[in-house]
UniProtKB/Swiss-Prot annotation:
A zinc finger (C4-type) spans 233-255. Its main location: plastid. Keywords: ATP-binding, Chloroplast, Fatty acid biosynthesis, Fatty acid metabolism, Lipid biosynthesis, Lipid metabolism, Metal-binding, Nucleotide-binding, Plastid, Transferase, Zinc, Zinc-finger. Zn(2+) binds at residues 233, 236, 252, 255. It catalyses: N(6)-carboxybiotinyl-L-lysyl-[protein] + acetyl-CoA = N(6)-biotinyl-L-lysyl-[protein] + malonyl-CoA. GO terms for biological process: fatty acid biosynthetic process; malonyl-CoA biosynthetic process. Acetyl-CoA carboxylase is a heterohexamer composed of biotin carboxyl carrier protein, biotin carboxylase and 2 subunits each of ACCase subunit alpha and ACCase plastid-coded subunit beta (accD). The gene is accD. SUPFAM superfamilies: ClpP/crotonase (SSF52096). Belongs to the AccD/PCCB family. Pfam families: Carboxyl_trans. Gene3D superfamilies: 2-enoyl-CoA Hydratase, Chain A, domain 1. Component of the acetyl coenzyme A carboxylase (ACC) complex. Biotin carboxylase (BC) catalyzes the carboxylation of biotin on its carrier protein (BCCP) and then the CO(2) group is transferred by the transcarboxylase to acetyl-CoA to form malonyl-CoA. This is Acetyl-coenzyme A carboxylase carboxyl transferase subunit beta, chloroplastic. The lineage of its organism: Eukaryota, Viridiplantae, Streptophyta, Embryophyta, Tracheophyta.
C-alpha cells in the first residue's frame, strides 16, 4: 500500500479537487478530467491552480468529472491511502480499496458529511430528481446508503459513464483508442519475461502528445487483475462492460458489431427457458489416428479445451422450444478448438438430424467453425459427406425444414457441407464466411484478396444466402419461418 497526497477544497458548497504527485510521477496543474487545458505547476502552486467550478464553463467535461477523471483511473483501481485537506484546513486519511469494497475516512465523520452534502446539493442542481433523469447514476454517488457498501457500484457506474457515455471520448475514435483506460486495461508486455515491464501510452491534457512511461510490476498485475471487467470490440476496439455485455447479446455498444458468442449463450438466447434437453453429452473424441504433435498431444489438447470451456466437444446438440415451437438445434462453439469438425462433431450432428427426422421436427444449425479438424485427418473430412447424406434424406425425402445460421467465422468443411444446405440460410451482420481463408488464398494463388470480399454483406449481394438478421430479432424471425412452414407452438399460451 502506498500513500498519495490529495488536496481538496470545499468552498461555496462545491467540491474542488487537485492532485499533487511526486516528481518521479509528474504533476497535473489542472483538475483531473480536464483534457483540454495545459500547465506544469507543482504542489506549491496549488492555491493558484485551484479554481471555482463556476469559472470552468469552457471545459467540455461535466463538473463531477473533476473528482475522478480518466487520467486518474490507476488511482481508482489501486489499493491506496489518500491524504485530503478540506476547506477548514483539517486533514484526513482516506483508505480506498475497490476489490474489497472499502472506502474509509480516519475516525472522523465531519469530512464525509461535508463531502456528501456537496454531492447532494450538486446532484439536485444539475440532475434534478433521480427518477426523472437516467444519467443520475452515471455520475453521482448514492448518499442515502453507506459509502462502504455501495462504493463498488459507484465506481462501476463512473467507469461505464467515462468509457461509454462521455462525449469527448465517443466523438473522437483516434483519441479514444489511445486513451489511458484503453491502454491500461488492454496493454500487454510483449517480452515480459525478459524486461519485466510494459509500456503504457497516456493521453495528455493537450490531446496532441503521447507520453511513454514504464509501468512497474504492480501496474502489470493490476492490468491483468481488472481486464476481466471489460470486453474489447474486434471492430472499433471500444470497451464494453462485461457485466452488461451478455444482456446486450454480445453486441458492441459503440459500433453495433456482433462479437462471438459461446454455444451456451446462443442456446439461452434462442431456446425458451426450461425447455432445453441436450443430446449425446457424454460423446468424446479418442484420437482415432494417433495424431503426432511435437507441441501438445491431441488428447491433452482436448482435455485443455474441455476444462477451459466446460464442453466435451465443439458442438452442443439437443431439443427445445422456440417461442413454444419444438425444434432440434445444434450450436457450434468456436472457443473449442476453433469449432473444428471432427468425428464426434459430425456424429452428434448426424444423430440430431436423424432424431428430428423421426420426430418430424424442424432443425436449426448455428455454424461457427474453422473447418475440418486436422488432428483426425480423413475421418474429419468424411463427416461432410455423412452429414450431407442424412440432410438430403431429411429435406428431400421427408420434406422437413432446415435452417442454417452462419456466424463469424464459418469456413472450410462446414461451409462446404451442412452450412450451405439449409432451406433458409441466415447470416449474422459482418460475419466472416468463406471456404478458404484470406491468407491461404493469397499464399496459394499469389493474388490479393479484396478487403471485405468474404464478409456477409458482400456475399449477400452475390446471392450466397437468403438474408442477414441481427441477433435481436432472430428468435422472432425463426418463429415466423417455422409457422409459415406449418410448425406451430404446442399450446395457445406460447409466445408467437
Amino acid at each position: 500500500m502506498e500513500g498519495r497526497r490529495f488536496d481538496s477544497v470545499l468552498s461555496y458548497g462545491k467540491l474542488e479537487y487537485w492532485r499533487g504527485l511526486s516528481k518521479s510521477m509528474g504533476s497535473f496543474s489542472s483538475p483531473i478530467g480536464n483534457i483540454s487545458g495545459s500547465g506544469d505547476s507543482t504542489i506549491n502552486d496549488r492555491d493558484k491552480t485551484i479554481e471555482n467550478w463556476s469559472d470552468r464553463s469552457s471545459y467540455s467535461c461535466p463538473n463531477v468529472d473533476y473528482l475522478f477523471g480518466v487520467m486518474d483511473i490507476l488511482g481508482l483501481v489501486s489499493d491506496d491511502t489518500f491524504f485530503v485537506r478540506d476547506g477548514s484546513g483539517d486533514t484526513y486519511s482516506i483508505y480506498f480499496d475497490v476489490e474489497s469494497q472499502i472506502f474509509e475516512i480516519d475516525n472522523d465523520s465531519s469530512f464525509l458529511s461535508e463531502l456528501e452534502s456537496s454531492f447532494s446539493s450538486y446532484q439536485n442542481s444539475r440532475f434534478g430528481p433521480k427518477d426523472d433523469n437516467r444519467d443520475y447514476y452515471c455520475y453521482m454517488y448514492d448518499t442515502k446508503y453507506s459509502w462502504n457498501t455501495h462504493i463498488n457500484s459507484c465506481i462501476d457506474s463512473y467507469l461505464r459513464s467515462e468509457i461509454s457515455i462521455d462525449s469527448y471520448i465517443s466523438s473522437s475514435s483516434d483519441y479514444y483508442n489511445d486513451s489511458y483506460i484503453y491502454t491500461f486495461i488492454f496493454s500487454e508486455s510483449v517480452n515480459d519475461s525478459e524486461s519485466g515491464s510494459s509500456g503504457i501510452k497516456t493521453i495528455t491534457n493537450d490531446h496532441d502528445s503521447n507520453i511513454r512511461e514504464k509501468s512497474n510490476d504492480n501496474d502489470f498485475d493490476i492490468n491483468k487483475k481488472y481486464r476481466h471487467l471489460w470486453v474489447q470490440c474486434e471492430n472499433c476496439y471500444g470497451l464494453n462492460y462485461k457485466k452488461f455485455f451478455q444482456s446486450k447479446m454480445n453486441i458492441c455498444e459503440q459500433c453495433g458489431y456482433h462479437l462471438k458468442m459461446s454455444s451456451s449463450d446462443r442456446i439461452e438466447l434462442s431456446i425458451d427457458p426450461g425447455t432445453w434437453d441436450p443430446m449425446d453429452e457424454d460423446m468424446v473424441s479418442i484420437d482415432p489416428i494417433e495424431f503426432h504433435s511435437e507441441e501438445e498431444p491431441y488428447k491433452d489438447r482436448l482435455d485443455s479445451y474441455q476444462r477451459k470451456t466446460g464442453l466435451t466437444e465443439a458442438v452442443q446438440t439437443g431439443v427445445g422450444q422456440l417461442n413454444g415451437i419444438p425444434v432440434a438445434i445444434g450450436v457450434m462453439d468456436f472457443q473449442f478448438m476453433g469449432g473444428s469438425m471432427g468425428s464426434v462433431v459430425g456424429e452428434k450432428i448426424t444423430r440430431l438430424i436423424e432424431y428430428a427426422t423421426n420426430r418430424s421436427l424442424p432443425v436449426i444449425m448455428v455454424c461457427a467453425s474453422g473447418g475440418a479438424r486436422m488432428q483426425e485427418g480423413s475421418l474429419s473430412l468424411m463427416q461432410m459427406a455423412k452429414i450431407s447424406s442424412v440432410s438430403y434424406d431429411y429435406q428431400s425425402n421427408q420434406k422437413l425444414f432446415y435452417v442454417s445460421i452462419l456466424t463469424s467465422p464459418t469456413t472450410g468443411g462446414v461451409t462446404a457441407s451442412f452450412g450451405m444446405l439449409g432451406d433458409i440460410i441466415i447470416a449474422e451482420p459482418n460475419a466472416y464466411i468463406a471456404f478458404a481463408g484470406k491468407r491461404v488464398i493469397e499464399q496459394t494463388l499469389n493474388k490479393t484478396v479484396p478487403e471485405g470480399s468474404q464478409a456477409a454483406e458482400y456475399l449477400f449481394h452475390k446471392g450466397l444466402f437468403d438474408l442477414i438478421v441481427p441477433r435481436n430479432p432472430l428468435k422472432s424471425v425463426l418463429s415466423e419461418f417455422f409457422q409459415l412452414h406449418g410448425f406451430f407452438p404446442l399450446n395457445s399460451n406460447s409466445k408467437h
